[in-house]
UniProtKB/Swiss-Prot annotation:
Residues 21-32 have a biased composition (Basic and acidic residues). One of its GO terms (cellular component) is small-subunit processome. Residues 1-65 are annotated as: Disordered. It is found in: Nucleus. Residues 51-64 have a biased composition (Acidic residues). InterPro entries: G-protein_beta_WD-40_rep (IPR020472), Rrp9-like (IPR039241), WD40/YVTN_repeat-like_dom_sf (IPR015943), WD40_repeat_dom_sf (IPR036322), WD40_rpt (IPR001680). WD repeats lie at residues 131-176, 206-245, 248-287, 290-329, 342-380, 409-448, 457-503. This is Uncharacterized WD repeat-containing protein C2E1P5.05. GO terms for molecular function: snoRNA binding; U3 snoRNA binding. Transmembrane segments: none annotated. It comes from Schizosaccharomyces pombe (strain 972 / ATCC 24843). Keywords: Nucleus, Repeat, WD repeat.
């Protein structure tokens, strides 16, 4: 029998032609038969054709869809989704959705993709607003280093390695909030119930020294802690049991930050390096070098970049992961007038406003606003948390007969910063007993204190802050989480006596849905 490979193509063509001729003859026979046969033939051919179409649709739905048709289909689906969300928020019929409202939502999404969306929350906070406060004490006996939240659960951690899980129990006020639109400042009453806790077991996969920082993954599945033992421990958020332990750092882990919308994590350490991790694959990605001193803080948003502060090297660095480059911003170069006469010795904390702006806090009490397009700060606010009281001569000298000359008062450090991403609201903390809220001006060239009648009062040193937005529409609120204690987060440089170690949660109701404004581009 001959191999089909060696057969001549002419024979194959002839066979194909003969096959087609046979089909034509069969069709002619069917036409000669009655109309019943025609109906049967048409029915069979249509069913075969429809079955063939179903198979194509099941296997490849978008095979025969052009690029323009696909864009049109996706745009219609997106508009329908936005309209449904607006209807749910406003409580009116879809036909009544105004074009301006829909256009503002589309503009908001575009600005969010560009990283230039600025939500105006500060103008929606009534100065006479009623703020509800809850204190998280639980089993914590050491200073807290972090308080984070995901949906209805709150997690707190202290230096001893104790991690406590809380559940929020919300009770609405008796008066109807739908009618007053927060004009008289109604808030949701806060109650938190401890439901689980976990202590460090000092084992191979757990911490063996003090904890310094706390973070939670964006999907709420993992709780991550860093400590003085050079370790990063990943725990299950449900059971609080340690699942993984990374020992890549060569010194104490000082800070953790999650990339927004992903499970990519950045960690900074006293070994002067930043490491990038993936919580999805539970793997190490890369290491970033450049700082000359201990890296005390790191923060990140949606893009593949992060901002870090290097302590006494007095620099802030923007790390561009994809471009494999970094931008260096040097502090301490401003005039003595801008710092109220106090020299800057260390940059201790950082918070990103958007992809192009961030704020830093220093040990001389200065909060600085930076842009990635300029090497110098756009604006500095000196003595943001005031001065410490003057010490008595016997307190600052070891001599039996100290010199009566008084030492000038020293500024309170900025121990923590936090911001709502892509908004004009951020918060700062120290050990003066108050969390201060700040309003960024339009154009992002300055900021000022946000005045409210009821201060956000806490006890002790504010070691960590986090801000989040809760609810939608008329029920929207800004929630502030604070981790406080008798000592600072990474040492006993400042100790306060008679202060409980606890966390605090504040609910600040908003009057209406926040508006969106464009951020002006700042030229160098």
């Amino acid at each position: 029998m001959s191999d089909p490979f060696f057969t001549r193509p002419e024979h194959r063509k002839r066979k194909a032609r003969s096959a087609t001729s046979k089909r034509e003859k069969e069709n002619q026979k069917l036409e000669r038969n009655g109309p019943a046969n025609e109906d049967l033939a048409s029915i069979s051919s249509e069913s075969e054709f429809n079955g063939f179409e179903d198979e194509i649709d099941e296997e490849n739905e978008d095979t025969y869809e052009t690029a323009a048709e696909k864009r049109l289909r996706l745009a219609r689906e997106y508009l329908d989704e936005v309209k449904n969300e607006l209807v749910e928020d406003g409580g009116f019929d879809a036909k009544e959705v105004d074009r301006e409202l829909l256009a503002s939502r589309l503009k908001e999404d575009v600005l969010e993709k560009k990283g230039q969306m600025y939500l105006d929350y500060t103008s929606k906070i009534n100065p006479d607003v009623k703020i509800e406060t809850a204190q998280l004490r639980g089993r914590h006996m050491r200073p807290l280093v972090g308080v984070v939240a995901y949906e209805n659960f709150v997690y707190s951690a202290d230096k001893s390695g104790l991690i406590q899980k809380w559940e929020a129990l919300q009770e609405k006020d008796t008066e109807n909030r739908e009618n007053d639109d927060h004009e008289i400042g109604k808030a949701i009453k806060l109650h938190f119930r401890p439901i689980k806790f976990s202590r460090s077991r000092r084992g191979e996969n757990d911490h063996v020294k003090e904890i310094t920082c706390l973070a939670i993954s964006n999907d709420g599945r993992w709780i991550v802690t860093g400590g003085l033992d050079h370790r990063i421990v990943i725990r299950d958020s449900v059971t609080l049991e340690p699942q993984h332990c990374w020992k890549h750092h060569r010194d104490a882990v000082m800070g953790l930050a999650m990339r927004r919308g992903t499970n990519e994590m950045f960690s900074c350490s006293a070994d002067r390096s930043i490491k990038v991790w993936s919580l999805d694959q539970m793997s190490y990605i890369e290491t970033l070098f450049g700082h000359q001193d201990v890296i005390f803080g790191v923060d990140a948003l949606a893009r593949e970049r992060c901002v870090s502060v290097g302590g006494r090297d007095r620099t802030s660095r923007l790390w561009k992961i994809v471009e494999e480059s970094q931008l260096v911003f040097r502090s301490g170069g401003t005039s003595m007038k801008a710092t109220a006469g106090y020299m800057e010795g260390s940059v201790d904390c950082v918070a990103m406003i958007d992809e192009d702006h961030f704020v830093t806090g220093s040990d001389n009490g200065v909060i600085a606003l930076w842009s990635v397009q300029r090497k110098k700060p756009l604006f500095t606010y000196p003595l943001a948390h005031g001065l410490d009281p003057i010490l008595a001569p016997g307190r600052h000298s070891a001599e039996t007969s100290p010199d009566p000359v008084t030492i000038p008062p020293q500024p309170r450090w900025i121990t923590s910063l936090a911001a709502i991403p892509y908004s004009n609201l951020f918060a700062s903390g120290s050990w003066d007993g108050n969390i201060r809220l700040w309003k960024i001006a339009e154009g992002l060239r300055s900021f000022e204190p946000l005045t409210i009648a009821t201060p956000l009062s806490v006890y002790g040193c504010i070691n960590s802050l986090s801000l989040s937005l809760q609810g939608k529409g008329k029920q929207s609120e800004v929630r502030v989480f604070a981790a406080c204690g008798r000592e600072t987060r990474v040492g006993r440089w400042k100790t306060l006596r008679g202060i409980p170690n606890s966390g605090f949660v504040f609910n600040i109701p908003l009057t209406v849905i926040p508006s969106v404004t464009d951020g002006d581009e700042i030229d160098e």
